[in-house]
């Protein structure tokens, strides 16, 4: 997606071999117009898939997931990383390792929001080792829901996340694919959408 690639070139910062900082428009401060454009793009790509729910993990995946859900006319669910006092019903849970934060979290979704009748589009801000998306897939599997696709805002193609997900038979669509983050420079591959 050209607008996203340009924004990464202009405002993204490489912090190390595997870390890209995009806090001025995605992960801390959010650019609503860019989020809407990304959500709309995901909705266009998956328009014929019969999506009934869009799922993400809190926090940075929420904005593009919400815009995609709005465009598709379906609910959006975000998996929580910490159990809330208000989440006292039966939960779907999975363990997820975060490459950026270097911690493992338990993610959860209330079972009442996801069923075997659902066709799911998973959206996340980054794809590195694939563990976040894999955790969301596990939640869907626990509910019997079918994952129709995975939409990724920024893919670190030099890591093995895409391969992990494709080996699971999943359709992965990334708006920006990064070949490398070496020497402080972002090098891109051709994006999927």
UniProtKB/Swiss-Prot annotation:
A cellular component annotation (GO) from this entry: cytoplasm
GO biological process: purine ribonucleoside salvage; xanthine metabolic process; XMP salvage
Pathway terms, separated by semicolons: Purine metabolism; XMP biosynthesis via salvage pathway; XMP from xanthine: step 1/1
Signal peptide: none
Summary of pH dependence: Optimum pH is 7.4-8.8.
Protein localization: Cytoplasm
Gene3D superfamilies per record: 3.40.50.2020
Positions contributing to xanthine binding: 20, 27, 156
The EC number(s) this enzyme carries: 2.4.2.22
Binding-site residues for 5-phospho-alpha-D-ribose 1-diphosphate, renumbered to this chain: 128-132
Record-linked InterPro entries: PRibTrfase_dom, PRTase-like, Pur/Pyrimidine_PRTase, Xanthine_PRibTrfase
Keyword hit for Repressor: no
Chemical reaction(s) catalysed: XMP + diphosphate = xanthine + 5-phospho-alpha-D-ribose 1-diphosphate
Domain of life of the source: Bacteria
Pfam families: Pribosyltran
Function summary: Converts the preformed base xanthine, a product of nucleic acid breakdown, to xanthosine 5'-monophosphate (XMP), so it can be reused for RNA or DNA synthesis.
Subunit structure as annotated in this protein's UniProt entry: Homodimer.
Family stated for the protein in its record: Belongs to the purine/pyrimidine phosphoribosyltransferase family. Xpt subfamily.
PANTHER family the record matches: HYPOXANTHINE/GUANINE PHOSPHORIBOSYLTRANSFERASE, XANTHINE PHOSPHORIBOSYLTRANSFERASE
NCBIfam families per record: PRK09219.1 (NF006671), XPRTase (TIGR01744)
Name this protein carries in UniProt: Xanthine phosphoribosyltransferase
Organism: Enterococcus faecalis (strain ATCC 700802 / V583)
Name of the encoding gene: xpt
